[in-house]
UniProtKB/Swiss-Prot annotation:
This is Probable endopeptidase p60. Gene3D superfamilies: endopeptidase domain like (from Nostoc punctiforme) (3.90.1720.10), LysM domain (3.10.350.10), SH3 Domains (2.30.30.40). Residues 146-188, 251-323, 367-408 are annotated as: Disordered. The gene is iap. It comes from Listeria seeligeri. SMART domains: LysM, SH3b. Residues 28-71, 198-241, 318-361 form the LysM domain. It is an enzyme of class 3 (hydrolase). Its EC number is 3.4.-.-.
Length: 523
């Protein structure tokens, strides 16, 4: 572009002080020729459009051939800043329409040479390299003394034309557009990332996507390394962020049984249960494994929960001495029998155990004298008072149980109404539930009152074997320190329960369930 320039004056002296506004380095005039624009004149003279308009008292960008313009070159006030995003794209011009030159890592120090009208900065980085970045992703400014002479960088000639600048300004008004293209993560106060870390403990606000960006791993890899079936993570969860740590990150079955908050971590997100009384509020956290059907790969497969029996237990023995922490369910599981059989062998009427008790765990249940001459009312087969029935002491009349056909149908129908509703700790319904809140609510709709916690519900029911279990019975699970979960049995090995994925069907023998199954209870 050819222009006629006539030097008018040169400043006699320049006063430069730290933190002062830019000072005039020299002054000249140019005569506008056909085809000239303010933007082109500014580029040729090492200044900006705003400086030209201010020096010549222009209110628009319109100029005409023959017009004389005063041009002032400015000594830029250089500022040292650092990249506040995780990664920041450096472009060839001031706007997202320009090509990406490189990307700078968070914390990289740069020198701001100038600021454009759209908020973008021309920067110097590395060994004298220049480019443009969005100024909103620079922070920690340290102001240096102004340079004595103006620098016009060659890269400035690659700036877009004024019409493109206007387009860029519109885009900058939409933060999402810039965020997606130029800053991987825009947290200005993010702590330094340990790039050598192999695991990460989840904190409030963390997401799988944020961790993938932070550690440079894909979301798919993180989910694979941690056996996650969804992108849901929870505070305190230990996440492998490098493949080398994948085998060591399955949450351990760790039980903390101290009151008032008992928390167990096995292989899945937390399921918690709240107990409310009129005078106090006791919080009980129940943690389950991933609730999934038998056709789903569950995170529980990767967990190595501590086995219930101690390694020294002789499973061939016919008796067992009760130790601290034992339950009938755990003992039954150890010796391959059922709770009801152990109770029958030992004449137990409740599930309460005392440390030191010696229990029979194998043998034949003694026959019961079933002569009904003294108890004719137990005869359910005919009207002859001399007939015998089996086990008259056990009343199997299902009309006296909540599990009879009509009651069971009503209970299951009520449970099905809530399929898909959300889980919440302490949820009593009808919009959200925890496990025992769900069973309490469903039974209450049929006029049956249950205790509020799963442990209390287990204690209040009559225990039945799986072969005796009927739809409408309760099914209980123990993860190592007592009853921790309850669902409503619907038959065929299925239950409806409230767990961390909401109210849903689950296979009681499926992955993450079968190894923790204690047994069934009838209300």
């Amino acid at each position: 572009m050819n222009m006629k320039k006539a030097t008018i004056a040169a400043t006699a002296g320049i006063a430069v002080t730290a933190f002062a506004a830019p000072t005039i380095a020299s002054a000249s005039t140019v005569v506008v020729e056909a085809g000239d624009t303010l933007w082109g004149i500014a580029q040729d003279n090492g200044t900006t459009v705003d400086a030209l308009k201010k020096a010549n008292k222009l209110t628009t960008d319109k100029i005409v051939p023959g017009q004389k313009l005063q041009v002032t070159e400015v000594a830029s006030e250089k500022t040292e800043k650092s990249v506040s995003a995780t990664w920041l794209n450096v472009r060839s011009g001031a706007g997202v329409d320009n090509s990406i030159v490189t990307s700078l890592k968070g914390g990289t120090k740069v020198t701001v040479e100038s600021t454009e009208a759209n908020g973008w900065n021309k920067i110097t980085y590395g060994e004298g390299k220049t480019g443009y970045v969005n100024g909103k992703y620079l922070g920690n400014a340290v102001t240096s003394a102004p340079s004595a002479t103006p620098e016009v960088k060659q890269e400035e000639t690659t700036q877009a034309a004024p019409a493109q600048q206007t387009k860029t300004e519109v885009k900058q008004a939409t933060p999402a557009a810039t965020t997606e293209k130029d800053a991987v993560e825009t947290k200005t106060t993010a702590p330094a990332v340990d790039t050598n870390a192999t695991t990460h403990t989840v904190k409030s606000g963390d997401t799988i996507w944020a961790l993938s960006v932070k550690y440079g791993a894909s979301v798919q890899d993180l989910m694979s390394w941690n056996n996650l079936s969804s992108s849901s993570i929870y505070v305190g969860q230990n996440i492998a962020v490098k493949q080398s740590a994948a085998k060591n990150t399955a949450p351990k079955a760790e039980a903390k049984t101290e009151a008032p908050a008992a928390e167990k971590q096995t292989a899945a997100p937390v399921v918690k249960e709240s107990t409310n009384t009129s005078t106090t509020t006791t919080v009980k956290k129940e943690t389950t494994t991933e609730k999934q059907t038998s056709t789903t790969k569950a995170p529980a497969q990767a967990a190595k929960p501590a086995p219930a029996p101690a390694p020294t237990v002789n499973t061939n023995a016919s008796s067992y001495t009760v130790k601290s922490g034992d339950t009938l369910g755990k003992i039954a599981s150890t010796f391959g029998t059922t709770v009801s059989k152990i109770k029958a062998l030992n004449g137990l009427t409740s599930d309460n155990l005392q440390v030191g008790d010696v229990l029979k765990v194998k043998g034949t249940v003694p026959a019961t004298n079933t002569n009904t001459a003294t108890a004719p009312t137990t005869n359910t087969n005919n009207n002859t008072s001399s007939s015998n029935t089996s086990t008259p002491s056990k009343n199997n009349n299902t009309n006296q149980s909540s599990s009879n056909s009509s009651s069971a149908s009503a209970i299951i129908a009520e449970a099905q109404k809530h399929l898909g509703k959300a889980y919440s700790w302490g949820g009593n319904g009808p919009t959200t539930f925890d496990c025992s809140g769900f069973t309490s609510y469903v039974f209450a709709q049929s006029g049956i009152t249950l205790p509020r916690t799963s442990g209390a519900q287990y204690a209040s029911t009559t225990k039945v074997s799986e072969s005796e279990a009927q739809p409408g019975d309760l099914v209980f699970f123990d993860y190592g320190s007592g009853i921790a979960h309850v669902g409503i049995y619907v038959g065929n090995g299925q239950m409806i329960n409230a767990q961390d994925n909401g109210v849903k069907y689950d296979n009681i023998h499926g992955s993450g369930w079968g190894q923790y199954l204690v047994g069934f209870g009838r209300v």
